[in-house]
Structure formats: structure tokens, C-alpha cells
Amino acid sequence: MNEQKMNEQMKKTAKTSGQKGPGGRALDRLTLKQDEARPVQNTRVEAPRVTYTIRDESEISPETEEDGFPDGYLECIIRGEFSEPILEEDFLFKSFESLEEVEQNLSRQVLEASSLLESSLEYMTKGTKQEKTEVTQETPPLRVGASSLLAGGPAEKPEGGVYCGVLSMLECPQAGCKKKLRGKTALRKHMLVHGPRRHVCAECGKAFTESSKLKRHFLVHTGEKPYQCTFEGCGKRFSLDFNLRTHIRIHTGERRFVCPFDGCEKSFIQSNNQKIHILTHAKAGKKC
């Protein structure tokens, strides 16, 4: 009876094999245990053959060299801490490129500045040359006239014909003054006489047109003569240094002022004496 019940139960489980409940699961466990209890057949399982190639350290392919990152670096990339691998070689290469660009820019700026300087110097030299040529073309050659000699100062005898017509006298335009003067400079100086006399002496009331003349006149009242001749046996004193210099020429024999006319060898210590001598040539009508 027990065996019949067992068979019926087995049939029921076979019919309901599509729907596994708790009983089905238990049956599965039972069958697994029965399978484990069975003897294992002698089956030969071959292990997979793994071949390893050992290369020298010098023989590294470019693929392994490019992908040869450290493990920690790869972990950082996987985590997302680094977006792109940054190599030291790339950084150095970029820095060298930037330095080369800077050097090129500097050299370009230096070349531009030097070319600009050369062009400006060339322009300046051209301008000065043109100005010199214009001045030499327009300006006639100057000669030393009698007016410069009459103004005083040492001079050599000029060539003949220089003083022809130069000694023409200029008449004072002031009414009642018939004085004639040599040149415009002498005339301007003479016109100060006719001007207002603003500089008045406090001692005698004499007025002067220039302050320098008032100072010179005031030495007459004071009697001051600070300039003394140092030559032995002379000892003369003068109120002005100009008079002392003129006096010293008497001792030295220096005659700086030479007659400018040809054939006349006269020379003078003072410029006033030279001017008076030149007038004698003009009055005599001596031709140049």
C-alpha cells in the first residue's frame, strides 16, 4: 500500500511539473542529492593553453609605450578626476613653441624699429643737405666790410676794392642835428642821444640815456679808481677796466687796429684813432 501511494504521488508531481511550488522545489533538491551521490564518471578536462612571450626591455612597441600609464593614473581617469592625460613632453613642447613665438615677435619688433630709425635718419640727413644747398645757392658770399672794422677789433688788411662805396655816411634824421654817421649801428647808438634821459645823477643832476653811462659818470664824484697799472714805474689808476686795458697797450706796444686800405701800413692802439684815420682817407678821396 505504501508503494502504491508513492507511485501516485510521483505521477501527480509529474503532471504539475510546469508549476513548481514548495513541493517541487523540495523534489529538485532531492534529485540533486541523488545526482551527487552517483559516482562521477572519469571525464578528462584539458586546461586552456596560455602562451607567454617575454620581450626585452629595449623592444617596446609604440602601442605599449603610448598606453603605459601607471595604475593610479588610470584609476583617476576612470573616476573622472582627469578628463585628458597630460604628458610632461607635451607641456614642454608647448612651452618651447610659446618661447619661439615670443622670440619671433621680439625680433620682428626690433627689425621694424631699426628700419624706422634708419628711414628717419635718412630723411633728416636729406633735409639737412637740401637746406645747406639752398643756403649756399641763395646766400651770396659775405665779405668783411669797413663797418665791422670801424666797430673796433683787430683785423688784417683786406683785398683792394672792398671798401669802395662802403664809407657812405648816414645823416641823423633828427631835426636840427646834422651829424653824419657810418653805418646803421652807429646811427642807432647816436639816436639814443635824442631819446629821453631817464637816468639822472643824484649829485649834479646830469641826465643820461643809459644806466651804464650814469655809473661811469658817478665815479667822477666819488673819485674811485680801483684799476691800477701794474707795470714797473707807472702806477697809474683808472676808474674803468676798459681804460686800464687800453693803457697797458702803450707799455706792450700792441697795435691791434690796422688801417684797412692798401698801401697804408698805419696801426693804432685804440679803435677810435683807427676810425679817425679812416675818415682822412675818405675825405682825401683816395680811390680803392
Curated annotation (Swiss-Prot):
Biased composition (Basic and acidic residues): 1-11, 26-38
GO molecular-function terms, A-Z: DNA-binding transcription activator activity, RNA polymerase II-specific; RNA polymerase II cis-regulatory region sequence-specific DNA binding; sequence-specific DNA binding; zinc ion binding
Protein localization: Nucleus
Species this chain originates from: Mus musculus
Similarity-based family: Belongs to the krueppel C2H2-type zinc-finger protein family.
Crosslinked positions (Glycyl lysine isopeptide (Lys-Gly) (interchain with G-Cter in ubiquitin)): 213, 215
Residue ranges of coiled coil: none
Residue ranges covered by zinc fingers (C2H2-type): 170-194, 199-221, 227-251, 258-281
Keywords: Activator, DNA-binding, Isopeptide bond, Metal-binding, Nucleus, Repeat, Transcription, Transcription regulation, Ubl conjugation, Zinc, Zinc-finger
Pfam families membership: zf-C2H2
Keyword Transmembrane helix in record: no
Name of the protein in its database record: Zinc finger protein 42
Tissues expressing this chain: Restricted to testis, to germ cells in the early stages of spermatogenesis. Not expressed in spermatids, nor spermatozoa. Expressed in embryonic stem (ES) cells.
Protein modification: Polyubiquitinated by RNF12, leading to proteasomal degradation.
Function: Involved in the reprogramming of X-chromosome inactivation during the acquisition of pluripotency. Required for efficient elongation of TSIX, a non-coding RNA antisense to XIST. Binds DXPas34 enhancer within the TSIX promoter. Involved in ES cell self-renewal.
